[in-house]
Every structure is written in structure tokens, then in C-alpha cells.
Amino acid sequence: MIKKIILVLSLFGLCSLAFAEGKVFNKDYSGIKEIQATITTDEGEIVIDLNFKEAPNTVANFVDLAEKGFYNGLTFHRVINGFMIQGGDPDGNGTGGPGYTIDDEPNKLLHEYGVISMANRGPNTAGSQFFITQMAQHHLDGKHTVFGRVTKGNDVVCRVEQFDRIINIKILEKK
């Protein structure tokens, strides 16, 4: 009998996970012209214009985590030269996140050279992990939410090595 109860409870838990919706941030962007993130790494600074018009919830999630200091001290745990650098995993091995997921935000932004996009394990599974492209990666279009573009520090993106640290991420909202 106890085994049946455990089985039923386990199935209920799995079903509730399957139908869970991603976390939604209700950030008001009225009056804001642009949002920039400066990622300070062991190799230098990367400045990114965040596109809150095309990916409002994704940007709000990234900004919220950055302002809480979530990314401070984490590493770029995955670096594939000529492809991308990936960070934002508190476990440092590609499996960690903030304890919740956000839904994808399909948009017209493409995986061109120097864009920031959310890493995921499939549809609607993004959390805190992001990657920055070192070259155009159009095979990723429609599979990951692009939410910004590097405006300064592409040379830093190309110098980052696996396990280099994200010292901090500072957010600047221009009105």
C-alpha cells in the first residue's frame, strides 16, 4: 500500500512539473530607452545592449539575476572556440540554474556574431545560463532566445577561456 501511495505521489509531482509555466517578470519598461549590461570577466569587460523590446521577460530575468549578484563569481563553464562562451551555471557543469525556468520568447533576432542568448535543455527550460556567440550560429535560430548584442568587448569574448570567472554584471538603464 505504501508503495502505491509513493507511486501516485511521484506521478502527481511529475505531472505538475510537466504542466508548470515559466516564471514571468512584470517589469515596466516605459520611459526606458536602453538597458546595458557590463559583464566584468577575468579577461576584461563585455558591454551588451539588452533588447527588452524583443525579449522583455528574458531581459527582466537576466537583469534580476545580475542585480541580485547571482552571476558574481560564476565561471564560463563551456567555451567552444569559434562558436560561443557559456556561463551562468552555479554548479559549473551545465546542469545548474536559479531554481526556476522561463518560457522562450521567439523573436526576429538571429544568432549573429556577438549576440547573447539563453541556453536551454529544450523548449521553455531556460533559467540563468546564457551564451555569447563568437560567430554567426544560424542553426540555433528559433531554438534559443536572443536578447542582446555585444557593443564593446568582442575581443574579450574571443579571449575568454573555460573556467574564466564572471566577476560581476552591472546593469545600466538609460531613460
What residue ranges belong to the model's regions?
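Cyclophilin-like peptidyl-prolyl cis-trans isomerases
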Residues: I2, G13-K175
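Sec-dependent signal peptide recognition
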Residues: K3-V8
